[in-house]
């Protein structure tokens, strides 16, 4: 059976955002069963885990002898087995892949730049100086994305693909950056899919409500 790694606990602001959600959603869209390997605090830094995921992040995807990391690679791999994510027609398949890459390369870095400043470093002077510029750069990218989406329900027209899965999870990171109603409606449309709801419920159910105990001195 497919196994994915996920955290057993994260702070409340990160719940529903940790990147195993993307893989859970893809597996739900594909109708593929899976189980989770829940990591306690520090497990991601062990030599065993770093051999599987050199950066100590979640998720990893394991099936038989195959181990993958990076959500883009994992979602595209799942899509190879699910026309619900990657169409069979070569040109449509290539366009879906294009939007997966665009979400991760052209949009997410700029949204994450804002997230890091506002969530982790908001009180530091350098962050105060960079915040407005970071938000404006991200807003420019989102304006370009909204124009590319136009009035279409999904990025490639009437059909939801892996590109929409990836893009909508990226856009959820900081919702208030989405000032264009077209993007707001787009994310609402994507996340209204039953597979997303199942994936989100599964992630939230795996989190312990209590914070991990501090290690003994």
Regions flagged by a language model, labelled:
Residues 1-129:
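GST-like domain detector, emphasizing the conserved glutathione-binding G-site
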Residues 21-24, 191, 195, 210:
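Small/flexible residues
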Residues 36, 87, 158, 199-200:
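A generic structural-conservation signal
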Residues 40, 162, 203-204:
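Short, solvent-exposed turn/loop segments enriched in Gly/Ser/Thr/Pro and often Arg
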Residues 44, 69, 119, 170, ...:
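Alpha-helix termini
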Residues 103-194, 199:
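GST-like fold's C-terminal all-alpha helical module
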Residues 199-217:
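Terminal-tail/helix-coil boundary detector
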């Amino acid at each position: 059976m497919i196994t994915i790694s996920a955290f057993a606990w994260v702070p409340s602001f990160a719940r529903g955002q940790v990147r195993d959600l993307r893989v859970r959603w893809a597996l739900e869209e594909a109708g593929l069963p899976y189980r989770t390997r829940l990591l306690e605090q520090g497990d991601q830094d062990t030599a065993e885990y770093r051999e599987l995921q050199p950066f100590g992040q979640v998720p990893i995807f394991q099936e038989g002898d195959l181990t993958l990391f990076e959500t883009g690679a994992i979602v595209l791999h799942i899509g190879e087995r699910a026309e619900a994510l990657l169409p069979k027609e070569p040109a449509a398949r290539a366009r879906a892949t294009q939007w997966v890459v665009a979400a991760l390369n052209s949009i997410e870095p700029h949204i994450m730049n804002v997230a890091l400043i506002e969530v982790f470093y908001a009180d530091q002077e350098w962050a105060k100086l960079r915040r407005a510029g970071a938000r404006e750069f991200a807003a420019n990218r989102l304006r370009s994305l909204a124009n590319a989406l136009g009035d279409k329900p999904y990025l490639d027209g009437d059909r939801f693909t892996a590109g929409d899965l990836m893009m909508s999870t990226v856009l959820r990171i900081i919702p208030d950056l989405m000032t264009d109603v077209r993007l707001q409606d787009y994310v609402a449309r994507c996340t209204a899919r039953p597979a997303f709801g199942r994936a989100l419920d599964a992630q939230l159910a795996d989190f312990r409500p209590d914070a991990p105990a501090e290690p003994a001195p």
